[in-house]
Amino acid sequence: MIPLQRPPLTDQLEAELARRTEAIRKAGPTTATGRAAWRTAREPKARLRTLLHRMTPGLLRCMYCGDNLGTDIDHFEPIARAPLRTFDWHNHLLACAYCNSNQKRDRFPTDPASGTPLLIDPATEDPADHLLLYLESGAYQGLTAKGHATIDVFALNSRAELVRGRRLAFTVVKALLRDWHTRTTAGDHATAAEIADALDLLWQADVVRAVYRLTDNRPLAEVVLGPEAFTALTALT
């Protein structure tokens, strides 16, 4: 999971979403009215999906697990809990079908004392404040209550394919960095530029970001990456 930038709505789309929200309010804001309104909103959903595609890490990856293709518009705060947020642009994220339908569903843990959400919203906060990714193992450690809840709801550590995918992605990133170093040293700057672009499009954007963050601790980065990959990383950041 990485931080994301939410683009603004057009005035036309913002007005359309507000109109549909008001219709839910007038009909009675229930789970049923919210879901019915969402099912029939084909054209606004298509435009929202286009905007969400602009936010996604890598090649249209799920904003939660980062591993699978983002196919579903997820309501961060579920319709069952907040029907009036059905058409709230700030409540929409792109999820894979598995995270949306099998893991999160209507789950939305909150702090029992304050009522604040305990899931990380990557569009409003930096997941690295709550999650630490161990690159060698591919596993996450929760640093806060939000981090622990997010790991639990999306099964970020208990889905073996996610952990293995992150671990293998780290191997790929190191190989690409070494190749970038080799190509640059040989004067093949065109291929080196393609490699740098490939790093930005890897399916596991959280792994790439965790590698870039190693520059905060350069002695550790050199040990973890090796000399050639470390040299490439320092040149690219």
Task: Please give the residue ranges for each predicted region.
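General N-terminal leader/first-domain-start detector
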Residues: 1-42, 229-237
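C-terminal, charged low-complexity interaction regions
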Residues: 154-237
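Short, charged surface segments at domain edges that flank catalytic/cofactor-binding sites
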Residues: 18-61, 83-86, 90
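Histidine-centered nuclease catalytic patch
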Residues: 61-94, 98, 103-118
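Charged/polar, solvent-exposed surface patches and flexible loops
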Residues: 15, 19, 36, 40, ...
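Conserved, surface-exposed functional patches that form binding/active-site neighborhoods
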Residues: 107-110, 114-184
